[in-house]
Amino acid sequence: MAYDDRETGLTVEDRGSKLGLPQNQDAEANVLAAMLLSPDVVEEAQVELQPDDFYRPIHKTIYTAMVDMYNSRIPIDSISLIDYLRSINKLDAVGGEAYILELMGQTLSLVNWQHHAAIVRRDSMLRELIGATNEINALAYNAPTDTKEVVELAESKLLKVTAREVKSSYKTLTEFCLLYTS
């Protein structure tokens, strides 16, 4: 029996094909705009997000470029980003100068960028979970007679999805001491 999605009225099976994978392009764009406007955001965003968290390939490319620029101590602004993307032959692939300048126009992005980053991360995690469950489905349908192996593989795939969240909640002793002695 397939369950209905209360919002869309679609079955679970139909939802993926009709609505696509979880993603929020506006949240992605706002995070990138905030990174363009503040070097502090670039530093913090690297802790919160990875390139694969971005659904749109152009957003992944822009994010990676800004992180590379930051790590190379290249100042991040629209002109420098356009120049950097041009130098690595990716400017046209991300929509050209027009898209970078469009991002710069989102000046309110600094206000809620952390919330938007959380949305990007949440949707990424949901996509990972969907991928893992699809793999688990395939394993179950092609299961050997020993189901223990299938269950272990399924557990492994689900744990892989949550591993990053668990890791990010742990702090080293030094981090803990710095946090509570300041």
Where are these regions (language model features)?
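Noncatalytic partner-interaction/assembly domains of nucleic-acid and motor enzyme complexes
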Residues: 1-124
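Active-site phosphate-binding and catalytic loops of NTP-dependent enzymes
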Residues: 70-74, 164-169
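Extended, charged alpha-helical coiled-coil/arm scaffolds that mediate oligomerization and mechanical coupling
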Residues: 97-163, 167
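Conserved small/polar residues in nucleotide/adenosyl-binding loops
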Residues: 180-181
